Amino acid sequence: MPLSYQHFRKMLLLDEEAGPLEEELPRLADEGLNRRVAEDLNLGDLNVSIPWTHKVGNFTGLYSSTVPCFNPQWQTPSFPSIHLQEDIVDRCKQFVGPLTVNENRRLKLIMPARFYPNVTKYLPLDKGIKPYYPEYIVDHYFQTRHYLHTLWKAGILYKRESTRSASFCGSPYSWEQDLQHGRLVFQTSKRHGDKSFCPQSPGILPRSSVGPCIQSQLRKSRLGPQPAQGQLAGRQQGGSGSIRARVHPSPWGTVGVEPSGSGPTHNCASSSSSCLHQSAVRKAAYSLLSTSKGHSSSGHAVELHNFPPNSSRFQSQGPVPSCWWLQFRNSEPCSEYCLSHIVNLIEDWGPCTEHGEHRIRTPRTPARVTGGVFLVDKNPHNTTESRLVVDFSQFSRGNTRVSWPKFAVPNLQSLTNLLSSNLSWLSLDVSAAFYHLPLHPAAMPHLLVGSSGLSRYVARLSSHSRINNNQHGTMQNLHNSCSRNLYVSLMLLYKTYGRKLHLYSHPIILGFRKIPMGVGLSPFLLAQFTSAICSVVRRAFPHCLAFSYMDDVVLGAKSVQHLEALYAAVTNFLLSLGIHLNPHKTKRWGYSLNFMGYVIGSWGTLPQEHIVQKIKMCFRKLPVNRPIDWKVCQRIVGLLGFAAPFTQCGYPALMPLYACIQAKQAFTFSPTYKAFLSKQYLNLYPVARQRPGLCQVFRDATPTGWGLAIGHQRMRGTFVSPLPIHTAELLAACFARSRSGAKLIGTHNSVVLSRKYTSFPWLLGCAANWILRGTSFVYVPSALNPADDPSRGRLGLYRPLLRLPYQPTTGRTSLYADSPSVPSHLPDRVHFASPLHVAWRPP
């Protein structure tokens, strides 16, 4: 007969136990009993022949694709002109006095942030915008282009103008304009590994030299020596400044590069012009080899035509207009859905390209992207605005992956020790937190996004269109793109974007100027930045509390009036540093702080209500006696694991589920195991703050017996049969807690100290978790442990009781006070003393 739920609870000692704990508890360590219970609860039978269940409530397998939902009415969020002040360290010093070593180090990390991956894989421009919504290809293309354009205008992206230059908007930083003695300085990092062809690296070019530079001397390029007249011979054409570059000694025929420049052509100093010249010549040949549409030296879209050098058409006609969009103006409509109808709607479609306010030299940047982008809802609660998802996952994959730096995440107990108090709380919302942190321009070539232009994008995704023989953009196949769907989409989009349709239909390549969200380095940098700022705020207001995790910043003060004054002072300080706060999203929590999914009050910590509801829903939908896919089990364990510390048996109760996930086998819930878990999660107990105190209770064990020292009283006992030492130590800790009721126990066993009971026999782990809940352990060396003698059967010998003070830890959770000096032989996991214990003692 299967094990009933009531019997199982009694066995785990969760109800009033029958016999004394010293007899009952060691039985739970018995292997035979654990095996029988596992069989009764159907926990051990992992190989099942019935088909697996792949969906439980909202949980589907971890790798199943949820169908994304496109919203044609998405609004692009606005980005304020975010500019973090470069003298942030000096401003912090003015605010609080000299900074600590840790604060200094963290602020220097992000001024500017650097990113040097081992290997960067460049992808064709066609992969710039991911075809994530097959039904809404054109709408998604324009919405994404508009989002990228908005980011560029806000100074978050660089726009690649040529192989070695880029333009951007917003205020420049000093590392973007390193000028010495009037000429640009070469500052390529050795680690970057980019052998520069140009004797200058990042530095802003004078605005007048935005037009391509011309040079008449003979220079060597990758294509071999060029005759002087074959170089970029510039000529004014009706004042438009467009240039025709022709590379004669090329075995692949003639290349026509026709950008429409934005200003008159200027001659530059020979060193800089040769660099631009080489990049243009290289670029022309490079793009001819690899792609039918590339970028010229000034970053405009170029069309490449493959004509024999003596072609009559080539000589007789003027340059073909290079803009795909404007070519429709001169062509006959092919049908009622021809794009020429849209192009002829207005005379002035505006420029083919826009330039930023500042121009900067960059390391060599190919006309490629390194990651794709697409749009999703801003968050589950806000579906009116979109969010850009950038996929730079190439840096986290394969043998050349970058191992991202680790950083401290506060665990539940540390968070409770720190924040559980009778303070009033409010939380601040930093708008676009990631986009505050500037990146060094040398990182730009590794973080490229963009698009190949509307014509290629549509052509690539429509089956009837062909890009043959580099003929894309000539009249024969110009109309291949025309279709009813495209026509209707563009007509609707014209209402939204107007003449920007033309600008967005051109190819573009953009590199990140601020840290992007899709790179593993970004969370680390953001955590360092906000924790350093909070550390400064805490030292400026020692009677208050400021704490942050990523972009979530909370402030606490003893009264509401005090909190409002603190809020005003801190807000002004953050604004003076250039940090943008969203005042509409400031939340005042009263005495119960909602933070990181928890509710934290003076009574301790509990999970937030929406998580409790999710758990209830999960148990309602959980099928019994049906094998559930282990990927779905991962989702279930993720949810239950978050709330496990608030239950009686904690993580050990979930061990059967962990075992099935590890074995990649389906898991079948028996009615008893499901009832046990759902009862566990029905009553959640708060995790309380640990209190400092003096340890008066000690325990010790050997494989055959245990001993306790409770004040001046000594006790000992023996086990029926010898047990593994860790199991014996855990049992001794349980006996000490149940005999003395003390919440502070001295032990020398590291496994007991860690309070992780998942590696013990399953039943014992569950019972011990409940008995030792809320107990703190203090390390006592074996030689000084008063319980050492009783555990070995010697009751007559008395060692003096130690005065062992206990101070609860707040871990390394971004509290960077000066740590005491440590001997060099200690491991490098140093305990950072909290400044709170110096300046302000929690009530």
UniProtKB/Swiss-Prot annotation:
Region (Disordered): 219-269
GO molecular function annotations of the record: DNA binding; DNA-directed DNA polymerase activity; metal ion binding; RNA-directed DNA polymerase activity; RNA-DNA hybrid ribonuclease activity
Biased composition annotated in UniProt, kind: Low complexity: 223-235
Region (Spacer): 178-346
Reverse transcriptase domain: residues covered: 357-600
Region (Polymerase/reverse transcriptase domain (RT)): 347-690
Enzyme Commission numbers on file: 2.7.7.7, 2.7.7.49, 3.1.26.4
Record Pfam families: DNA_pol_viral_C, DNA_pol_viral_N, RVT_1
Task of the protein: Multifunctional enzyme that converts the viral RNA genome into dsDNA in viral cytoplasmic capsids. This enzyme displays a DNA polymerase activity that can copy either DNA or RNA templates, and a ribonuclease H (RNase H) activity that cleaves the RNA strand of RNA-DNA heteroduplexes in a partially processive 3'- to 5'-endonucleasic mode. Neo-synthesized pregenomic RNA (pgRNA) are encapsidated together with the P protein, and reverse-transcribed inside the nucleocapsid.
Note: Hepadnaviral virions contain probably just one P protein molecule per particle.
Protein known as: Protein P
Gene name of the record: P
